[in-house]
Curated annotation (Swiss-Prot):
Phosphorolytic 3'-5' exoribonuclease that plays an important role in tRNA 3'-end maturation. Removes nucleotide residues following the 3'-CCA terminus of tRNAs; can also add nucleotides to the ends of RNA molecules by using nucleoside diphosphates as substrates, but this may not be physiologically important. Probably plays a role in initiation of 16S rRNA degradation (leading to ribosome degradation) during starvation. This is Ribonuclease PH. Keywords: Nucleotidyltransferase, RNA-binding, rRNA processing, Transferase, tRNA processing, tRNA-binding. The gene is rph. One of its GO terms (molecular function) is 3'-5'-RNA exonuclease activity. The keyword tRNA-binding applies. Belongs to the RNase PH family. It comes from the Bacteria. Homohexameric ring arranged as a trimer of dimers. The keyword tRNA-binding applies. It holds the Pfam family RNase_PH_C. PROSITE patterns: RIBONUCLEASE_PH. Gene3D superfamilies: GHMP Kinase, N-terminal domain (3.30.230.70).
Length: 239
């Protein structure tokens, strides 16, 4: 098995997390998984959705989008089409669920955090890059809210990261790029906490059904890659 990038089966793409990437948001990063690049911002606003009013807890929600020419051919903006596509809705819900798992919302006060993930260049793994980068931006945003005295305590329960794994040419591989993803027999997106818990596992057999042994091999590979991602997040936060 030869990966198009020349990477080993268990090798992540070069990953870079640049903090404080934009001026106005409480937290922001540019996250790069190889040639996939996503700007993740976290904005804090006072108040919560109607269903949470008066309960003394906060909320987190997410939006996701891709620039028209983030891919090989230009895609029409969803705003000009008048509605979001099913893929966009699925991904932004995944991002929201994943980041809420990192927080104790009762310590957020009646504040809402808006996660915005905008893909400026796509080469596979945009949702996993978004979750990994948005976690760092979220931690920076919480530090800003703490300085403002807006928090009841430390809402952060755990770090969260995500990575893709798949079966490519019959072999489990880590962190698929677009060429691999397009030809993979199986594709999984895995979201985990730094304590080793799984938040979400999304898996689809594209070429042939996968067997329990292959699923276990992919999950083990994801866990291995996740440890590297948590180290990269911590290193970025230490800068």
């Amino acid at each position: 098995m030869n990966r198009p990038s020349g990477r080993a089966a268990d090798q992540l793409r070069p990953i870079r997390i640049t903090r404080h990437y934009t001026k106005h948001a409480e937290g922001s990063v540019l996250v790069e998984f190889g040639d996939t690049k996503v700007i993740c911002t976290v904005s804090a606003e006072s108040g919560v959705p109607r269903f949470l009013k008066g309960q003394g807890q906060g909320w987190l929600t997410a939006e996701y989008g891709m620039l028209p020419r983030s891919t090989g051919e230009r895609n029409q903006r969803e705003a000009s089409r008048g509605k979001q596509g099913g893929r966009t809705l699925e991904i932004q819900r995944l991002i929201g669920r994943s980041l809420r798992a990192a927080l104790d919302l009762s310590k957020l006060g009646e504040n809402t955090l808006y996660i915005d993930c905008d893909v400026i260049q796509a080469d596979g793994g945009t949702r996993t890059a978004s979750i990994t980068g948005a976690t760092v931006a979220l931690i920076d945003a919480l530090a800003v809210l703490k300085k403002r005295g807006a928090l009841k305590g430390n809402p952060l329960k755990q770090m969260v990261a995500a990575v893709s794994v798949g079966i490519y040419q019959g072999v489990p591989v880590l962190d698929l790029d677009y060429l691999e993803d397009s030809a993979a027999e199986t594709d999984l997106n895995v979201v985990m906490t730094d304590s080793g818990g799984f938040i979400e596992v999304q898996g689809t057999a594209e070429g042939a059904p996968f067997r329990p042994a292959e699923l276990n091999a992919m999950l083990e590979l994801a866990q291995q890659g996740m440890q590297e991602l948590f180290e990269l997040q911590r290193a970025a936060l230490a800068e």
